C-alpha cells in the first residue's frame, strides 16, 4: 500500500514567520512543505533540522518566497544583504532532502549551503541567481546536470561549489567559442561562462583567454582530453573526480592553479603537451603557490612533452604524496637532462645559504617516450 506524504503549505510574513507556525506541529512527521512569502535565518535552521538525520522532510517548495532576512558572505568573507537568498549553512547535511524548488527570484546561495545533501536530485537555478557560494553543493552525488546562468559573472561560482556532485554542466552558450579556423563563434564583447561537453569554462574576449573552471566530478568518463585553446586550469577544477583515470592537457595549457587536481581516487595518468608549465596562486595577495596536485593515490604515470626541464615548474608536482611510486616519462634524448637538472633552494634566513637539488630524481624513474608515436595513439 502506498503511503501518502504528509504535506503542509504556509504563507509567511515577518510578523508570522514559518518557525512560529510550525511550533505547534509535530515537525518530524512532515515530508513535504510549500512556503510562500517570507523566510528568515530561524526558518532556515528549522527546515535544515527537519530535513536532517532526525527529520523526515523530503520535498521543499520555495518558489513563491519573495523576501528573506539573512546574509550570505561574499568572496571577501563579508556578509552581503540581498532581497532573496538561501542562508549560509542552510540545508548542510540535509540527508533526507530529495527535491527543492528554489525561489523564482533567488539572488544568492550561501556557503556551504546544501553541502552533504546526498539524496538531493536535480536543482533548477532561476535566471535571477548571481552568486553560488563556496562548497554550496559539495558532496551531492545525485545532483545530475547543472545549469549555469549567463547572469553569473566571473568569481560568482565560488571554489568547490559543485565538488563531488554534478555529472554535467550546461550554459546558455554550449559550444566552443572558436571554430577550426580560429574564428570566434560568439557575438558581443564578452562570453563569460560557457559549457563544452559537460565541462564549465570561462572566457575573456579582451585577451582571448579561456579558463577551465570545473569538471563535473560525477561524470563517468575515464579519460578526458582538455580542449585545445584552454590556457588556465582554475582552483578546484578537478576536485573529487570519482571516475577519471587519465587527464590530458593540450599544447595551449601552461598554467595550473594551486588546488586544481585533488582527491581523484582513480586518477592514474597525467599528460602535459605544452613545452612549458607553471603554477598560479588562488589569491593575488599570496606570495607563493603550492599544492597543485594532491591526494591522487593511484597516480602512476606522468608524461611531459617538454624537452627542457627548465621550462617546467617542479612545484606543480612537489606535493605529490606518492612521487616515489610515479614514473616520469619525458621525450627521447631528454632523460639525462631531467636527471641532471638542479633546482636552487635558498634559506629563508640567509639568502646566501643555497643548496642545489636534483629534484626530478624524486620520481620512481625517468623514462623516455616518442611524442610522435604517442600522438598517433591519441594520447
Give residue ranges: language-model regions.
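Predominantly extracellular/luminal carbohydrate-interaction, adhesion, and secreted-enzyme modules
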Residues: 261-262, 289, 293-294, 312-318
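Surface-exposed repetitive/solenoidal architectures
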Residues: 8-93, 205, 234-240, 262, ...
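A general structural signal for stabilizing positions within well-ordered secondary structure
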Residues: 24, 50-51, 77, 91, ...
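Structural signature of tandem-repeat unit edges
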Residues: 5-13, 31-39, 55-84, 95-108, ...
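Consensus positions within tandem repeat domains that build extended binding/scaffold surfaces
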Residues: 88-90, 110-113, 133-136, 158-161, ...
Amino acid at each position: 500500500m502506498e503511503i501518502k506524504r504528509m504535506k503542509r503549505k504556509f504563507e509567511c510574513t515577518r510578523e508570522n514567520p514559518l518557525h512560529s507556525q510550525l511550533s505547534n506541529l509535530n515537525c518530524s512527521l512532515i515530508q513535504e512543505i510549500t512556503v510562500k512569502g517570507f523566510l528568515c535565518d530561524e526558518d532556515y535552521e528549522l527546515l535544515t533540522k527537519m530535513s536532517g538525520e532526525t527529520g523526515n522532510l523530503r520535498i521543499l517548495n520555495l518558489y513563491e518566497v519573495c523576501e528573506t532576512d539573512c546574509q550570505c558572505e561574499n568572496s571577501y568573507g563579508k556578509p552581503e544583504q540581498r532581497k532573496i537568498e538561501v542562508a549560509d549553512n542552510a540545508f548542510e547535511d540535509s540527508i533526507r532532502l530529495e527535491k527543492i524548488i528554489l525561489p523564482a527570484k533567488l539572488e544568492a546561495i550561501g556557503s556551504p549551503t546544501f553541502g552533504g545533501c546526498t539524496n538531493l536530485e536535480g536543482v533548477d537555478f532561476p535566471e535571477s541567481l548571481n552568486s553560488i557560494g563556496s562548497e554550496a553543493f559539495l558532496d551531492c552525488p545525485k545532483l545530475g546536470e547543472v545549469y549555469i546562468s549567463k547572469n553569473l559573472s566571473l568569481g560568482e561560482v565560488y571554489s568547490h561549489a559543485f565538488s563531488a556532485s554534478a555529472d554535467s554542466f550546461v550554459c546558455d552558450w554550449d559550444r566552443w567559442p572558436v571554430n577550426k579556423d580560429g574564428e570566434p563563434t560568439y557575438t558581443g564583447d564578452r562570453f563569460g561562462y560557457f559549457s563544452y561537453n559537460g565541462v564549465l569554462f570561462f572566457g575573456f574576449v579582451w585577451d582571448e583567454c579561456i579558463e577551465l573552471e570545473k569538471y563535473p566530478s560525477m561524470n563517468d568518463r575515464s579519460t578526458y582530453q582538455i580542449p585545445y585553446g584552454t590556457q588556465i586550469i582554475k582552483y578546484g577544477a578537478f576536485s573529487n573526480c570519482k571516475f577519471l583515470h587519465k587527464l590530458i592537457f593540450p599544447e595551449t595549457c601552461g598554467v595550473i592553479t594551486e588546488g586544481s587536481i585533488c582527491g581523484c581516487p582513480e586518477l592514474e595518468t597525467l599528460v602535459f603537451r605544452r613545452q612549458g608549465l607553471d603554477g598560479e596562486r588562488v589569491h593575488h595577495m599570496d606570495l607563493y603557490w603550492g599544492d597543485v596536485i594532491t591526494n591522487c593515490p593511484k597516480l602512476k604515470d606522468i608524461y611531459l612533452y617538454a624537452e627542457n626541464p627548465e621550462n617546467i615548474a617542479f612545484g606543480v608536482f612537489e606535493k605529490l604524496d606518492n612521487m616515489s611510486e610515479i614514473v616520469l616519462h619525458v621525450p627521447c634524448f631528454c632523460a639525462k637532462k631531467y636527471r641532471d637538472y638542479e633546482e636552487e633552494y635558498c634559506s629563508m634566513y640567509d639568502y646566501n645559504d643555497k643548496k642545489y637539488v636534483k629534484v626530478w630524481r624524486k620520481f620512481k624513474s625517468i623514462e623516455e617516450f616518442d611524442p610522435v608515436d604517442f600522438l598517433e595513439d591519441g594520447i
